[in-house]
Design a protein with these regions (language model features):
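A short helix-loop-beta submotif of the ANL/AMP-binding
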Residues: 93-99
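Conserved PLP-anchoring active-site segment centered on the Schiff-base-forming lysine
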Residues: 69-91
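N-terminal small-domain helix-loop-helix segment of the aminotransferase-like
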Residues: 1-58, 65
Length: 175
């Protein structure tokens, strides 16, 4: 299916093309306001401020920055398995030890987190940083609110910082 682009989009491209630099940018108030409004409208998040929003150029760059800020080379990081290969590469490139908590399929074939396994691995490996992916990549599982809350309680009890990758959450549909 082929159709013409809306004139406003063409105009925006032309305006951007006239700008002398195509690289980095300084986030504007409008940039932050749009994120704050979207989070409130889409996810019911209230109280979000400009100061709480960081700019990163992609999920893996953000994960790398968070790893460097909140952990040291050689430290163990918890991830669910199967694991997004991008997380594996970033963890290895940053010299972190990967500890997997295996997702399990229930009797209906639905992937489930094993909270007891998560808790045990966090304790045994003295883990204080985990990567959580919602919806999960690569299995595609959209976690239910109760499951996310249970996982966050396990992390909280273990004083574990969570890097939460929710890049595809806007594609979740009701039902």
């Amino acid at each position: 299916m082929n159709f013409p682009t809306v004139p406003a989009i063409q105009k925006s491209f032309q305006e951007r093309e006239a700008h002398p630099a195509f690289g980095y940018f300084d986030p504007t108030d409008e940039y932050f306001d749009s994120i704050i409004r979207w989070q409130e409208k889409r996810n019911g998040v209230t109280g979000l401020t400009k100061e709480a929003i960081g700019y990163e150029n992609g999920v893996l760059g953000c994960v790398s920055s968070a790893l460097q800020a909140f952990s040291a080379p050689g430290e163990a990081i918890l991830v669910h398995s199967p694991t997004y290969i991008g997380f594996t590469h970033v963890l290895e490139e940053n010299g972190r030890k990967i500890v997997h908590s295996q997702l399990k399929r229930d009797e209906r074939g639905i992937w489930r987190m094993d909270y007891e396994d998560m808790d045990r691995r966090l304790k045994e490996n003295r883990i204080h940083l985990a990567i959580f992916c919602s919806p999960h990549n690569p299995c595609g599982r959209v976690w239910q609110r109760e499951e996310i809350e249970a996982a966050m309680e396990v992390y909280r009890k273990n004083d574990c910082i969570v890097i939460s990758d929710e890049i595809w959450s806007d594609l979740i549909l009701e039902g």
